[in-house]
Amino acid sequence: MVKQENIRNFCIIAHIDHGKSTLADRILELTQVVSQREARQQYLDRMDLERERGITIKAQTVRIPYIAADGQEYELNLIDTPGHVDFNYEVSRSLAACEGALLVVDATQGVEAQTLANVYLALDHDHEVIPVLNKIDLPSAEVDRVKAEIEESIGLDCSQALPVSAKTGMGVDAVLEAIVHHLPAPKGDRAAPLKALIFDSWYDSYQGVVVLFRIMDGSVRKGDTVRLMSTGKEYEVLRLGVFSPEPTDVKELFAGEVGFLCGSIKELGDARVGDTITHADRPAETAVPGFKEVKAMVFCGLYPTESEDYENLKAALEKLQLNDAAFSYEPETSQALGFGFRCGFLGLLHMEIIQERLEREFEVGLIATAPSVVYKVVTMDGKTLEIDNPSHLPDPTKIDTLYEPYVSMDIHVPNEYVGNVMKLCEEKRGTQKNLHYLAANRVVVTYELPFAEIVYDFFDRLKSATRGYASMDYHPLDYRASDLVRLDIMLNSEPVDALAVIVHRDRAYTYGRGLALKLKRTIPRQLFQVAIQAAIGQKIIARETVSAFRKDVTAKCYGGDISRKRKLLEKQKEGKRRMKRMGNVELPQEAFLAALKVGDE
């Protein structure tokens, strides 16, 4: 057993593509935890999707035995955290499980938005942060400029910053020595009652829920009965172990150590990230602070393309929810799309990942409706409602005030694109709060924007306005009263609930015009005329018409009486009228995509 003062728990903070997973790979190889033969790129990113997108979605841990230059044996626990804003709560819990962090910055790129967001989280936890400059083997690396940027934006002393190249392995041994000498050992009393923080959990079909935890005080043995403090439920520890990096069973874990346990926990909701584990017979007095319920921020409807796939989609969503407590869903029906589900997500990346996993891992064809956020409605009789589906918005005459969520957004951008960014944010109803120069050619612009405005296409448009150079980070602020209306789309006077959206009154007309035009281009022509109308309440604000195919019914009449032709034309007209009354318009998937792309042109 390693002494407590020789344990180091650390995580690696970096923006996407700055080399976090590569550095982790090198550390594992250098300490011979993973042999060269078993090594694969991004060893800790287990999901194919994580590897492909180059992002970390779930936290992973690995125990690394390390003999330092002074001959002492240390136990290093690397906790690999997600880097994206959507998973901010998971990051904050992973950081709470460590005492220090390596801040990896790409020496060719400099400080980016998500690096900053996560560093501030680490500093909130009073972490010791070691700056590491990666990719110094590239000719475009500017070490001094990036050091100055880190000092300017974060206020970290970079005189001791470590230059490394995670790709070639250069300088990685110095990183290990720095972890041992600069990061503090975990505090915690091994004799006190057990108190352990859950920082990740997932579902295993053989063992039930597997819980990753860090012991703050006390110790836990296999066979103990433990209690989860937020729910009060009790479980027997059937399996206890550590990842090094494959799961290895151990008999006992002590304060300061990181490990996993299985205890026939059936549902992921019972072992929530951020909860505290304690002994049933000798409980801790207080829980680890900072636990909160994760709430979905973005909602959208998911429907199977083939109605017989409904059961498959339901089973797939159940499986995904086992591994993702932040994802929620409930059944809903739409007149246009049939049976489906209303799903809640942490943010846009989370939504994209879930949709991609459904299509890839479960092979379910999907139609996704336009994403929406949660609005608060105060009705005339004083009730407050939370609305996540535009078609559930009450009648405008019954609404007293409508509130929408706002976010604060930091955008890092080279100064030649600041004008484009400001123009985009103004267009999205943003208010500028701050503009701050990081270096001579890098600016941080802070805006407050309605969350609904960034849900659609903000990120894509930001990237195209700055040629891909901007990076952004946002966090929720509060709810503010806004002049919002529900825009309904009607086909032949029948409202299509799946296309309803909530928009600001000033933008309703242009949005309605744009959407009607897009739909005109995407809805295939029928044998009867299709009228596309955009309406606010009873008032029609835009209309487009998809003209009908026309069969030449008089082609076979040569000469002869005009009344014969007229009779055939009247018969055709009557048939079309009946068809229009009876017929329904099939909406292709492109029609729903069109709703997301209004305003692109």
UniProtKB/Swiss-Prot annotation:
Keywords: Cell inner membrane, Cell membrane, GTP-binding, Hydrolase, Membrane, Nucleotide-binding, Protein biosynthesis. SMART domains: EFG_C. GTP binds at residues 17-22, 134-137. The gene is lepA. InterPro entries: EF-4, EFG_III/V, EFG_V-like, EFTu-like_2, G_TR_CS, LepA_C_sf, LepA_CTD, LepA_IV. Belongs to the TRAFAC class translation factor GTPase superfamily. Classic translation factor GTPase family. LepA subfamily. CDD domains: EF4_II (cd03699), EF4_III (cd16260), LepA (cd01890), lepA_C (cd03709). PROSITE patterns: G_TR_1 (PS00301), G_TR_2 (PS51722). Its EC number is 3.6.5.n1. Pfam families: EFG_C (PF00679), GTP_EFTU (PF00009), GTP_EFTU_D2 (PF03144), LepA_C (PF06421). It catalyses: GTP + H2O = GDP + phosphate + H(+). It is an enzyme of class 3 (hydrolase). One of its GO terms (cellular component) is plasma membrane. Residues 5-187 form the tr-type G domain. It is a peripheral membrane protein. This is Elongation factor 4. GO terms for molecular function: GTP binding; GTPase activity; ribosome binding; translation elongation factor activity. It comes from the Bacteria. It is found in: Cell inner membrane. Its main location: membrane. Required for accurate and efficient protein synthesis under certain stress conditions. May act as a fidelity factor of the translation reaction, by catalyzing a one-codon backward translocation of tRNAs on improperly translocated ribosomes. Back-translocation proceeds from a post-translocation (POST) complex to a pre-translocation (PRE) complex, thus giving elongation factor G a second chance to translocate the tRNAs correctly. Binds to ribosomes in a GTP-dependent manner. GO terms for biological process: positive regulation of translation.
